[in-house]
Amino acid sequence: MAVTKEVGSFIEAPAFYGNLSGKENLEIVCKILGLPKSAVMDALELVGLTQYKDRLAKKYSLGMKQRLGLASALIGRPPILILDEPTNGLDPVGIHEIRTLIRSLPQKFDCTVLVSSHLLSEIELMADNIGILNHGRLLFEGSLDELKQRAVSQGYPTDNLEDTFLALIDADNRQRGGER
C-alpha cells in the first residue's frame, strides 16, 4: 500500500464502476488510500468535474472519464505521477486546460510528473524534459533545447518535436538493421 500512496497513475483508458457516480468512484480510491472523503471534492474541483460529481460514471463522455482518471491519480497528492495519454478524448479547450493543469502540478504539489504520449506536439507544449524510446531503448533523455542541439549536430530537422523524433527513430532503426 505504501507504493500506492507514493505513485499516482493514470492509464490511457481508466476503468471505473459505471453504476457509481464520479464522486462515489473517488470515494473508493480514498478508502483504499486511507484518505479523508474531503479529498474527493478537492480532486473533482482540480480537474473541473465538480458539477458532474453525481452523474454515473457510465454516462461520462470520454473526456470526462479522462478527467476522472486524472482526479483519481491526483487524489492523494502523490510525489510521483505517471500519466499515459492524459489528453486522449478531450476537445481543444479540455486539452489546453489539462495541459495547463499538468504543467502546474510540479510547482503546486512538489511532485514529478511522467507523461507518456504519442501526441508529440502536446509533449512539446507540456514537458520540461523528455525521453525518447525505440523498441525499449532510450535514445535520448534531456531538455527540449538539448534535443534540438543534438539534432542540429547530427543534421536532423528541428522544426518540431515530431520531425526530430522521426529522424532519431529512423536513424536508430537503420543502425539496428531496418527494424520498425
Predicted features, each with a name:
Residues 77:
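Conserved catalytic motifs of ABC-family nucleotide-binding domains
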Residues 96-109:
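Helical segment within the ABC ATPase nucleotide-binding domain
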Residues 81-85:
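Catalytic Walker B motif of ABC-type/P-loop ATPase nucleotide-binding domains
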Residues 70:
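Hydrophobic anchor residue at the start of the ABC signature
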Residues 27, 31, 37-52:
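Conserved ABC ATPase "signature" region
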